[in-house]
Amino acid sequence: MFFMDSKNLFKKAAELIKSSQKTMVLTGAGISTESGIPDFRSPGTGLWENMDPTEVLSTKVLFNSPEEFYRVGFKILSSMRNAEPNEAHYILSEMEKEGIIAGVITQNIDNLHQKAGSKKVYEVHGNTREGSCLRCGEKVSFELLEEKVAKEEIPPRCDRCGGMLRPDVVLFGDPMPHAFDLALKEVQESDLLIVIGSSLVVAPVNFLPGMVDGLIIINATETPYDYKADVVIREKASYALRNIWNLIKS
């Protein structure tokens, strides 16, 4: 790991990215804080400092207390949908367009990478665009879930079969989606991973940094993989990416 001032860290990161044969990016909640979405674990500001996620956004609550899930947990999910991408999201989209990165793996469910124009996005924790019927599998829009909840249809029911609807978000207790298998393959084929805004404590996504030779971490707080990283940058995502991207283009 390199201990340098920010200017030299940006330079080192840019050099690693330019020399990489295939670079993937892994993003966590920290990339979206500048869009007004609270992250989950930062001291003093983390969303889970005030509530237990396993008691709010879990399959246990969804199945055993669906009313509680839709009155508390669902509101958290719904609140993320009004956010807009910030500079960091747009830079990653531009980097993908220019062939500098191969794609983005995200732990986020806020859809901001797609809003910013990123094409190859692996949403390993699901999304807030769709929902599904637990009985017949019918796909519905997240907007329909919101409409039903707003009309006090709690839990919301499938118009086709009457089964309970749920958002297509990976809850605590859910298996990982197919997107994770695809993301895993991408990382195994890469020689560099850029981690942005993730504390790297949530399994199994936190295994990914150990599968590549090159590692850049941009995060506000320490991670368990700092010791392995070639570069660790303690700056806001947009500021760090702006400087790195300018160096790559120069």
From Swiss-Prot:
What reaction does this enzyme carry out catalytically?
N(6)-acetyl-L-lysyl-[protein] + NAD(+) + H2O = 2''-O-acetyl-ADP-D-ribose + nicotinamide + L-lysyl-[protein]
Q: Where is the Deacetylase sirtuin-type domain?
A: 4-250
What's the protein called, per UniProt?
NAD-dependent protein deacetylase 2
EC number(s): the record gives 2.3.1.286
User: What Gene Ontology terms describe what this protein does at the molecular function level?
Assistant: histone deacetylase activity, NAD-dependent; NAD+ binding; zinc ion binding
- Keywords tagged on the record: Cytoplasm, Metal-binding, NAD, Transferase, Zinc
Superkingdom, taxonomy of origin = Bacteria
Residues given in the record as NAD(+) binding sites: A29, T33, F40, R41, Q107, I109, D110, H125, S198, S199, N219
The catalytic residues are H125 (proton acceptor)
PANTHER family in alphabetical order: NAD-DEPENDENT PROTEIN DEACYLASE SIRTUIN-5, MITOCHONDRIAL-RELATED (PTHR11085:SF10)
In the record, the note on similarity to other proteins reads:
Belongs to the sirtuin family. Class U subfamily.
Intracellular or extracellular location(s): Cytoplasm
Coiled-coil residue spans: none
PROSITE patterns on file? SIRTUIN
**Binding annotation for Zn(2+):** C133, C136, C158, C161
**What this chain does, per the record?**
NAD-dependent protein deacetylase which modulates the activities of several enzymes which are inactive in their acetylated form.
Organism, by scientific name, is Caldanaerobacter subterraneus subsp. tengcongensis (strain DSM 15242 / JCM 11007 / NBRC 100824 / MB4)
Task: List cellular component terms (GO).
Answer: cytoplasm
Cofactor: how bound = Binds 1 zinc ion per subunit.
Q: Where does nicotinamide bind?
A: F40, I109, D110
